């Protein structure tokens, strides 16, 4: 299964505890995370910790990490310019690009949402307004 994730240190924390020898074990535990509903915690934890699953991090999410780091809302152990690529490499996260076609399609579809991540409130979700997800080997949760 391939899963697209939002800018969430919880995902990296869970995956790194499984795959990295030098794991980041910060306070972002899933049972305390505001975006994880109580009934989704165990399912999300199992999916993320299963190293047979792939985790994708969008360029937009990496940008949000950098913005939140700069604003002091997300204090990672090092500047986001080095933290994000290093964490992606160490935890086996693959990049997911967001290009102009994605943003243009959101506007053309007449969606009232100003976000290109309309389902970001659900853990491990990504949404496309058409069948773009069928072009990638991505299972949607």
Swiss-Prot record:
Protein residues bound to Mg(2+): 99
Enzyme Commission number, as recorded: 3.1.-.-
Broadest EC class assigned to this enzyme: hydrolase
InterPro entries (UniProt xref): TA_system_RNase (IPR052919), VapC_family (IPR022907)
Region (Disordered): 99-141
Function as written in the Swiss-Prot or TrEMBL entry: Toxic component of a type II toxin-antitoxin (TA) system. An RNase. The cognate antitoxin is VapB16.
Cofactor(s) for this UniProt protein: Mg(2+)
One function term, GO molecular function aspect: metal ion binding
Domain of life: Bacteria
Matching HAMAP family: VapC_Nob1
Protein name in the entry: Ribonuclease VapC16
Entry's family note: Belongs to the PINc/VapC protein family.
Species in which this protein is naturally found: Mycobacterium tuberculosis (strain ATCC 25618 / H37Rv)
PANTHER family tied to this protein: RIBONUCLEASE VAPC16 (PTHR36173:SF2), RIBONUCLEASE VAPC16-RELATED (PTHR36173)
Keyword Acetylation in record: no
């Amino acid at each position: 299964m391939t899963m697209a994730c939002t800018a969430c240190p919880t995902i990296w924390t869970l995956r790194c505890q499984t795959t990295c020898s030098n794991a980041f074990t910060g306070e972002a535990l899933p049972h305390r995370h505001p975006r994880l509903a109580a009934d989704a915690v165990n399912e999300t934890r199992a999916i993320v910790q299963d190293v047979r699953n792939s985790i994708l991090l969008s360029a937009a999410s990496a940008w949000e990490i950098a913005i939140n780091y700069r604003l002091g809302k997300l204090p990672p152990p090092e500047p986001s310019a080095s933290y994000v690529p290093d964490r992606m490499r160490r935890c086996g996260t693959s990049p997911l690009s967001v290009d102009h076609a994605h943003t243009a399609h959101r506007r053309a579809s007449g969606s009232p949402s100003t976000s290109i991540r309309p389902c970001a409130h659900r853990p491990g979700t990504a949404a496309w307004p058409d069948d773009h997800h069928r072009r990638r080997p991505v299972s949607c949760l």
